[in-house]
Amino acid sequence: MLVKDFITKELPVLKSFDTGEYALALMDDFKLKHLPLLSENIYRCLVSEKDLLAMPDPTAIIGDPVLFSPSVQEDTHIYEALALVTRYQLSLLPVVSTEGEYRGVITRDKLIDILSELCNADTAGSVFVLEVMPQDYSMTDIARLIE
């Protein structure tokens, strides 16, 4: 399961000439805490709501800051994307080509949906948890218990 299969391009991006006020409004409209900043379709950084609120003048343009820029390439496995989103508490993760060209994003919500599907969380059934000491572990005993 690769990231390229779950990319969305429906979310807005920021440009260096956008204002902090505009970026905050976009984040509020789309219920996001982060938005990617692009320059000529090249991913530059991930702008957070926290960074924008810390701006002395929210009506000033964002410019081309060198900030935090996490991203994954299109051929990255979904687990690596999940690890980054979890580690940095991101609302979305930009996806780029090998040349750094912006391809879209994968959202935290989409990653949770994928994880749920992988774990069969929405399927009816049961989960058995067996606590066994390592020296007592025997696959035949476990199979007999399950039968």
Model segments located where?
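Bateman/CBS regulatory modules and CBS-like beta-alpha motifs in cytosolic regions of diverse proteins
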Residues: 1-26, 37-38, 43-46, 57-84, ...
